[in-house]
């Protein structure tokens, strides 16, 4: 008997779901949200039970990888228990989480025990003052303690996510890489995405391409092309000097990954976003709440939604905002 498969109208198999469990965050990163962010009222967001119901239906329809995101997922009460329930779903191969690392010093071990298979940890600077400026509230030492706690808990292939911005942190690329090598971490360098209206800097002026990052790395290291994949948008390389770690480049502007896109996102409000860079969406919260105890209705809504998935986003690296919602509202 063949496995169920979600397919879009371009015959792309969709087997990767990113689920936001909260729009709230203890950081206010300059590229992610406004400093005086207004968060959603509690009644507008999905309950943990509703998030689990969506995960169950997606896995039943062939999803093999789920990533929990935020906001900062670890500030939501009960998230470790949610992880345990999702990780136990028959057929799911990977349960990952993207986090800013601020809570990992106390939660890394419980997450590992709950069945989370891999962590992505955001880290854009190793300078405490600059880190504070970029996150507006963050404590670098606490994040590094969280990274070390993840290693101690048993996580492997933990990945650092670094958003590279010209004039803000591009001078730290190789220092971040050296940090990753020292702790046996993978790292992805990410081009800034034009989500939400920000005031801290001009996106046109701060744009720093993946090609520029590779050129900077080549000043100190030897990059070797790799066929590695984690089912996400990163294109991977390895280093001759440290072959055990992977270097990824997420390039929504300069080398977009739309043609092989295999993922959809769900916001904490229950909006199923078919593309990071478009507003095509389906309100799964409305389906859930109008049809309690009828999982087949939710499955049908998910299957039908695949036909709304566009071929590509329309990101450009000028100052125009293609999508008004902030990254924390989207699910990072």
From Swiss-Prot:
Binding positions for S-adenosyl-L-methionine per the UniProt entry: 31, 71, 122, 193
Binding, [4Fe-4S] cluster 1: 25, 29, 32
Any GO BP annotation: Mo-molybdopterin cofactor biosynthetic process
Cofactor(s) the protein needs: [4Fe-4S] cluster
Pathway(s) served: Cofactor biosynthesis; molybdopterin biosynthesis
Keyword Iron-sulfur in record: yes
EC number, as in UniProt: 4.1.99.22
A Pfam family: Mob_synth_C
Keywords: 4Fe-4S, GTP-binding, Iron, Iron-sulfur, Lyase, Metal-binding, Molybdenum cofactor biosynthesis, Nucleotide-binding, S-adenosyl-L-methionine
NCBIfam families named in the record: moaA
Function statement: Catalyzes the cyclization of GTP to (8S)-3',8-cyclo-7,8-dihydroguanosine 5'-triphosphate.
Protein name: GTP 3',8-cyclase
Organism for this UniProt entry: Pseudomonas syringae pv. syringae (strain B728a)
Lineage of origin: Bacteria, Pseudomonadati, Pseudomonadota, Gammaproteobacteria, Pseudomonadales
Gene name per UniProt: moaA
């Amino acid at each position: 008997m063949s496995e169920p498969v979600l397919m879009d109208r371009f015959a792309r198999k969709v087997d990767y779901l990113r689920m936001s469990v909260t729009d709230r965050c203890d950081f206010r990163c300059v590229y992610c949200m406004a400093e005086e962010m207004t968060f959603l009222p509690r009644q507008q967001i999905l309950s943990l039970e509703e998030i689990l119901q969506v995960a169950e239906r997606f896995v039943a329809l062939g999803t093999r990888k789920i990533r929990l995101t935020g906001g900062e997922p670890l500030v939501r009460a009960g998230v470790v228990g949610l992880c345990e329930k999702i990780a136990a779903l028959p057929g799911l191969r990977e349960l990952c989480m993207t986090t800013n690392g601020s809570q990992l010093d106390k939660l890394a071990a419980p997450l590992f025990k709950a069945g989370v298979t891999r962590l992505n940890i955001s880290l854009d600077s190793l300078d405490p003052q600059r880190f504070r400026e970029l996150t507006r509230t963050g404590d670098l030492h606490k994040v590094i303690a969280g990274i070390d706690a993840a290693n101690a808990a048993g996580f492997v292939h933990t990945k650092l996510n670094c958003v590279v911005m010209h004039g803000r942190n591009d001078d730290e690329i190789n220092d971040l890489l050296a940090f990753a090598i020292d702790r046996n971490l993978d790292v992805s360098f990410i081009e800034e995405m034009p989500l939400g209206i920000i005031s801290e800097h001009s996106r046109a002026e701060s744009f720093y391409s993946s090609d520029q990052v590779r050129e900077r790395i080549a000043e100190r290291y030897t990059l070797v092309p790799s066929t590695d994949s984690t089912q996400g948008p990163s294109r991977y390389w390895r280093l001759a000097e440290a072959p055990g770690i992977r270097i990824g480049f997420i390039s929504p502007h300069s080398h977009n990954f739309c043609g092989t896109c295999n993922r959809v996102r769900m916001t904490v409000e229950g909006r199923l976003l078919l593309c990071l860079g478009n507003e095509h969406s389906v309100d799964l919260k409305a389906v859930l709440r109008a049809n309690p105890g009828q999982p087949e209705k939710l499955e049908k809504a998910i299957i039908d939604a695949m036909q709304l998935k566009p071929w590509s986003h329309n990101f450009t690296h000028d100052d125009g905002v293609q999508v008004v919602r902030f990254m924390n509202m989207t699910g990072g």
